[in-house]
Amino acid sequence: MARTSKRARRSSPLHIPSAFELFTPSKELVLKNIWIFGPLYAVPFIFWIHSWIWSPLPTQHVHWWGHADTLSAGWTGSPLPTYGTFLVVGFSLLWFILIAVAGTIVQIMTQAAQLDAIERRPLTFDSLWDTVKRLGWRLVGLYIVMGLVIGVGFLLLIVPGLIMLRRYFLAPYVMLDKNTGIREAMDKSAELTKLNTGAIWGVLGVMLLFGLVNIIPIIGGLASFVLGSLYSLAPAMRYHQLKRMS
């Protein structure tokens, strides 16, 4: 019987695998290049640990270090002395600046590494840093514009925000790959994601699913982080697949 389905065969370069099918190849590339992705993913993990340590206990509205006097004689009954509280405020401000700067740099390097890994290009920190110097400010502008557009969409109604998220999901990879401007990257992302909207929704759905693992007590946060890290190349893979279709 003649083949009547319009879907591409699995052996075809135009075949789009399901979002879950991307987990294994993504995991393999992450582990193969762990000397690059390991340090890059360690940075947000450190940020997460810091956030967890300084978050209030859910039932008592104090930080965990408020009970540290039971752990060491070096701690007083009060969480911190008055001068220490001011140090914490200053430290928090410095930490915010550190997160803004280091987090953005790591974000750019990570997305560049993801794209290079998919394209089978050699990964080095020198080349990733060159990408930051070459496209850093442009990508920062793209992140800001994307954040504003998607944020306004969610403020108006949830649905427009989701649509904007889907449309511009691949914009950073377009800019990294094609060296485009902000508007061109967003327009190209909208064009690519329109080729197969389900392929983008699928990846977003799996990412959300892994994020929900965080609600599991005790181990949920770590499990969510590990699963998300192993699946992190899926967006770059989708970009590569849809680019071949265009």
What are these regions (language model features)?
Residues A2-S246:
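Hydrophobic alpha-helical membrane segments
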